[in-house]
Amino acid sequence: MAKALGDSSLLSPFSETISGKRRAACSPRSFATGDIVARRSTQKTTTTVDSRETKKFEQDAELWWRERDGPFGPLHSMNPTRCSFIKDECLEHFKRKKDDRKGSKPLSGLRIVDVGCGGGLLSESLSRLGADVVGLDAGKENVEAAKRRQKESQLEDDEEDKCGTKVKYICDTAEDLGEKEPNSFDVVCALEVIEHVTDPRVFASALRKLVKDDGLVFVSTISKSLRGVLGAIVFAERLAKMVPAGTHDANKFLHPSELAIVLERAGLKTNSMAGMEYNLITKQWKLTNDLGINYIASASVGTFDEKLPSAQVDVNDKRYQD
């Protein structure tokens, strides 16, 4: 059940579980991780925005486009890898031909919302691929930074650089936009966002409300594992100082199987997952089968069914271990 994505060989998140001898059918109610998720969401909320988390990013809003020495440098280096995953998943899902020619617009005609867009890193890249993009962020300073970037791009001579000027940036929440424009987007992206919200289940439901019934949802985050904590907090924040101290809260990390259950309960069926691995020498990221630290997932609309592959969780799967 492996499938190729670009030059990387990727596995559906539960492919070993389905085809191997160690398969164990566990519903969210009987799986311990699902119980943890359930306990997190004990009261209804109208928004999952954590004002403390939003302020963290707003205080550095002026630095969103400092690629090499700024606090968002890791996101800049990660961006091509994230875009590669999104592009290839979209081509397969929407049955489009792959076109790697420079200047091609493989995502042309698709309406995409980038939830938690920050300064517009992903929004701009998706726009260059031809998509009609809405950049959404709850932080006013982040949205203003993205709009300033747009104005600067208008002065560029390179037409490809001007693509970023076509993005529509909005200061709002996923929950509110879902009420205003339900089922309006072919693709919904929430990359490196779910680990900063107050309630992942409510947030996932908001993503479901935004996407069309035949659309795709992309979520990337950090695994709730020892390696996830060591990589994202101990190394990236404290030792290498790649990102500011306090950027992440380990209690908000989500195990890959936990994320699948969160999405499932929101009506989204996980299609595939891929790990994202950072090379300290080349300072570049690549897609891998290792979901132990950073990972990205794609999901489509689907009603929960115990027979679905994403309901078949093997708690002994080595990819879910520390």
Predicted segments, located by residue:
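Short, flexible, mixed-charge acidic loops at enzyme active sites
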Residues: 229-238
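Conserved S-adenosyl-L-methionine
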Residues: 268-280
